[in-house]
Amino acid sequence: MRLNFKSLPELLAFNIKYYRYLNGYSQEKLAELCKLSPRYLTDIERGIHCPPISRLDVLAKALNIEPYELLLNVDRDKKIIQKMKSFRQYNQK
């Protein structure tokens, strides 16, 4: 399933959330691994902040991927995307 993104920060935000979900990390855990504040990571995932390249490298290493993968719009597993949406809705209650 290929998604449409309006901007690079939106694509980056989705990919960070996607790979974070695949790794089973909470925002707090990923922030800790990357030595970021949880609030800053939340803002990245909401597309409010676009991190510098040096941070992309740190995020990618923590997510067990190559940095360029954070910037790719490729087909994603529809089932995983649905699980991510369900998880997000559950956590917002």
Describe each PLM feature range:
Residues 1-11, 81:
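A detector for short, charged/polar N-terminal pre-domain segments
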Residues 35-49:
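Recognition helix of helix-turn-helix/homeodomain-like DNA-binding domains
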Residues 14-33, 58, 85-93:
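Short basic helix-loop element that most often maps to the first helix and adjoining turn
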Residues 10, 21-22, 50:
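Short amphipathic helical patch at the helix-1/turn junction of helix-turn-helix
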Residues 71-93:
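Short, charged recognition helix plus adjacent turn
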